[in-house]
Amino acid sequence: MKRNVFYGALLVLLLGFLVRENRLIHITKQVEKTEESAEWQPEWYEQMAEEINDSPITLEVDGTMVDPQLGSLRMSQDGQFMIPYGMLPDTLSCAALLYDGNRLVMERGNTHAEMTVGSPELLLGEESQTIAAPPEWENGILYVSLEAVTEVFSYEENWDAENRKMELTGSEDPATFLPESYDYRKAGRAPAVKNQGSLGTCWAFASVMALESRVRPEWNVSFSEDHMSLRNSFHFSQNAGGEYTMSMAYLLAWQGPVLEEEDPYGDGYSPDGLSPACHVQEIQVLPEKDYEAVKRAVYLYGGVQSSLYTAMVSDRDNTHYYRKETGAY
């Protein structure tokens, strides 16, 4: 009986040894180096990209975590990290403007760079460079090479694979991020000049044109001041005047904006059943008289609306600032 137990135990040990040795041999074969296995195979990038893109990537810029609601990086099929161009103003404090749906212009301070969708060329100032991953559209979002962006604006990249975090560290002084001068007309961001006439709709014109400048040059559109001033929830006449909180309420309630062609200005009539041309997701209210914040907002995002409070009772009055002959301040 004891001998049978002994042989049984010996058989188990022998089988265990064979299984272990076979596993060791299998592992050895996996890591055995050959000329063929030393080359990085394209399908490996695809597998890695699929795994990395399976959940959001955390982005940290100069030690500050980027709000994930702004968007997320992704990896292309050839192993390049890509960033939505719409994230650039908030994350890297640069203007990012899309012309004709395919030409991306990035600016910060005195730095000017251009890329074209599908093209490997990066134009940095007057110098042309080749980038590994051209800008590409994915699910309606334009992605640009993170490597190209960090090259343009002098950032160091560090990929923390364990925590799925990309860390960017800049070397430029934030005080140099704004240019010495900036002209919306030259940048193609200035909306067309409009005529308010004699109605008390200055607040609507200011809000609508600030919004128009926000979506330019990607979307050259004219929104309706008539709809904002007649179809808001305050039910004032167009001669009653208004102010910025009324336009904020109208836009954030998604009552508008509608297109100017659907509701032209000045006829006193606004048709029923018009749908918003876009949905405003966020409005920033800047600190009073913070002129640097105003400059930054104009450069990165679009025109700003300002409010003027006065003791004037009507437009028939004259003050230091208002001239009834011209109807202007």
Regions found by a protein language model. Give the residues of each.
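N-terminal intrinsically disordered, low-complexity tails enriched in polar/charged
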Residues: F6, L13-L15, H26
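N-terminal Sec-pathway targeting helices
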Residues: M1-L11, E21
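Primary recognition of N-terminal secretory signal peptides and signal-anchoring hydrophobic helices
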Residues: R20-E180
